[in-house]
Amino acid sequence: MIVTESFLPALNGVTTSVCKVLENLRARGHDALVIAPGTSPWSPTMTPERYAGYPVHSVTSVPVRQFRVGLPSYEIETVLHRFRPDVMHVASPFVLGVRGLTAARALGIPSVAVYQTDMPSYIRQHSGPAGNLTARAAWRWIRRIHQQADLTLAPSTAALHDLRANDVPRVALWGRGVDADLFHPDRREDPQTQALRRRLAPHGEVLLGYVGRLAPEKELHRLVELARVPGTRLVLVGEGPSRELLESQLPGAAFLGRQEGLDLARAYGAFDLFVHTGTRETFGQTLQEAAAAGLPVVAPARGGPLDLVEVGVTGQLFDPDAPGALAAAVRPLVAPGAAAQRGAMGREARRRVVERSWPALVDQLVDHYATAMGAAAVSVA
């Protein structure tokens, strides 16, 4: 059973991860059921009733800052009694997932909690002068949540360190997979990708691409630095509440909106360099997709990117506290004659991620399920 704080139609890292896990569990013949936030009077778009052949049980939700938050409900116990899973997988537990973990522990069902969202940093950002105080309170809540799990999985070494530093017990590392067939350097030769490049770079500009939510927590204000880098053009893929502000700050940039599947892969194929700005990423899935597409990556030297980018080999890391550091990291990679360097970095970036397929990562996840089941059996004994 998977209890998730986010699911379709919302598109984000939590949803993508859960969907890929379900697809690969189906391919291995496992049985599963999903509990997810459903529709509400304020958010009427439907949550699917099934995914990858598995039933999806929706619970009442309320909107919070454009996110659906599933309300804790005794429905979870009812579903648990009926389904009787061998293990419960809780994706990014914070509200709905807490109820899932509590119910699993009460019924003696082993549980694996997947830590995916740096909620303390997000809360700090939106709490003004009380930011540090509220962040500490968030960590106390996270510790209380994850103490109920038999195993907590962190997506990166930075996240693993944060969890351990805040006394979260029983933590292990589990990364994320990438579809290296969809995100592939050959997309660059696709006629539709070539047409997109001609439209975006009519004068041969070097295209600097960003993919992700257009929202304050992504710290996209840093992109203003890049507007002054000659011979380049920014291309942003994604939607969010910051789009109107960014369009005014970046009048020369191209905004492609939300893209999925092959259209997203072609967008990566059109880029020459991938840039990321946020410092609160527990992993950084779009960085991994860019690497699979054969792109060098420039990202902050903080959080998930530390695992994904090797300086001077697969891209560059910049100091997010130093004004102008992003532009300084980008300039050498877009200078005349730098195409060969970008190509070499992109090839090495792809070589390193190509084996991180979702099938391989779900095999690791199933091993973690077995570990949690063994730990639960020992604690009962």
Residue ranges and their predicted role:
Residues 296-299:
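Short hydrophobic beta-strand element within catalytic cores of glycosyltransferases
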Residues 36, 139-194, 202-203:
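Donor nucleotide-sugar binding/catalytic pocket of nucleotide-sugar-dependent glycosyltransferases
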Residues 341-355:
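A short, well-ordered alpha-helix in the C-terminal region of glycosyltransferases
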Residues 1-57, 358-366, 370, 377:
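N-terminal subdomain of nucleotide-sugar transferases
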Residues 311-312, 316-323, 332-338:
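Conserved acidic donor-binding segment of nucleotide-sugar-dependent glycosyltransferases
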